[in-house]
Amino acid sequence: MAVRATVSRFPATPEALESCAVQWGVAVTPFAAVDERGQPPTTGAGGDRIPRCEHCWAYLSSHCDLERWGWTCALCGTLNGFDDEAERRFQRPDACPELNSSFVDLEIAGAGGDGVQALPVYVAAVDLACSEEFLELIKSALLAALEALIPGSLFGLMTFSHKIGLYDVQGPIPLVKNVFIPPDLEEDGLPVALEDAMPLLSFLAPVDTCKDRIAAALETLRPTSSWERGAASGHEEDAVLLGGRGFGTAMSALIEYLSSGYGSTFALARVFAFLSGAPDYGAGLLDTRRYGEQYASKGVDANLALLPEQIPFYRDLAAVAVQSGVCIDIFAVTDEYTDLASLKFLSIESGGYLFLYANADDSTLPQDIYRLLSRPYAFGCVLRLRTSSDFEPGNSYGHFFPDPQYESVQHIICCDSFATYAYDFEFSHNNGFSRHTDPAVVQIAFQYSVIEPAKETSGDGSQSSASYKFSLKRRLRIRTLQYRPARNISEIYDSVDPEVVLHILVHKVILECVDKGVREGRHQVHAWLSLLAARYNQVLSSDVRTPLSSIDIDFSQCPQLQTIPQLVFALLRSPLLRLHEEGVHPDYRIYLQCLFSALEPSSLAKAIYPVLISYSSPDKQAFPRHTLSRAALIMSESPIFLLDTFTNLIVYYSSTADPSFPFPPPRDCLLRTTINKLKQDRCITPKLTFIHGGEDDSTLFESYLIEEQDVDGSGLTTGSGFVAFRESVRNVAGEIIQEEIGS
């Protein structure tokens, strides 16, 4: 569990919080194998036996004061007595992980779900209202997925278009049963329930014995023809192009189908839904005409109109999926408007991921799904953050849903080691921290389940397909941290973690954009940076009448703040906040919202302000980081650059590079080694591109050199982009200072 705070020295009072203008909160990556310093938790048993405070329900930790008969809660100060069992346990403190470490991960006895067959279940739902190219990509992706699945897993193959296809691959020849989707939305469901068409255990096949048959079934998949879709919907062939992708009906039926096995056959089923376009048939169909209309409309802001969901169907369906133990990952492969603003809820609210690929030609989908299945994940998670009594959690951010009864309790359906969540803080009362010498305490409890293989061998030592067993383990992970209140504003500034500040800022601006539009979101970000600059100058300036030209917007006396203007400028230039008029596809904006709101702070900072590294040769690094400007490239005089944008890795050879340097760089050089390591350390597969300046089109690489670009997107300037942005911040900061002097 990694926990990073925006400031390591907390503001001592509400006045100090307002005066510093810094975001106050934490970013939490609960299922990370190590903490933010690289240290693993202390593990053990007894997660169900840790004493809890009678007043605030916090867990006993190594930060608590222990006495012979009891302990004092580190969060609220309540004195709690030990029961007989705890008293006996704590007579041997060395055997109690919670007394020796502030970061523990303990198994909960008897909470593993006795009687539940904890079989890993995976289902592929494939769109057949598609092109041949799309289908070939999906076949490649599913073959990669089969290699990543552990033996003993169950796998089901379903297709959808104007009908649902269920595949039974457990016999010698793949058998498919079709159920037609009614085109009339007023009809009540399918004519035949999926369970009646094919029993669930015939649909779910053991991967270890049926892998070849599953692969054979994939080879039989063909796109449905326009004639076939027209005949099913009762239209003539030339009218069929309007319909044929019954995604909503198919997902609703699949969730109901799988729900019969929840708690008996499986504890969690993961569905991979592959889409080639917007649902346009049956329940949950989406009207994609609103995208075209926004271009031509007058008086309607496309920067606002295309961000909210069109219908609540998929959000409601996600709630049903959660109750059925189903997690859905959506893989959309299309450059057409698909309305991900509506579809995203089915994935992120059921614990899944949303992926978007513009085309099938150079898609990283096979690598992404293999990577997704190869990393460990937890499910059925409950995340709870508690604080000491002087402050409390305010807003919470991330792909979870709040508990309907308890505050600051979030439920996470499926969580991997990259998934990150955020909280901001507020004071409980106007006095702030009542005793500035005492540390503020944050405790994060994360209860989760994992499936662990427990192989059984036959008498002769061989492993039969039926002998793969899995056990369901319930665990409790607790992290307790202390933060000292700052004595003054300068201490707060000196303790800032700019990546975490950006992390919470991005969460806030995403919500603002969905609610009020991209323009308002951009305004909010610019206004915050201007306020931060004004507050910084007010704190450090001895003369309140500081002239405008003397306002320090580079935070020259505080290294921890110096990267923030660049990060904010890059955020405003990112597709997340670029205006619709610049050609940002609304689905791509939604994809970035979903991706960015799940990233940990360092990855998010890289996605917002990419890392540019120079090399003097493929085997020698020249400089670890440059600003994103053409001037930086010219001044460096290095011939080779590696640009890491998180989603892309671009190797750029300048036109002046030595012709003897091999292009692309050889696989055994330092540059390639660096690339391979970067690809391994992230949740998605970055797309690798090689560009030779002077010979290849350099537009992609140059588009990331943002510091010469106008922040409002009016076009490239002669180099005044970031400079002009700084001046605009200086002007607004000066106005804030003058207004407060006048008042």
Locate the predicted segments by residue.
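Extended acidic, low-complexity intrinsically disordered regions
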Residues: M1-S743
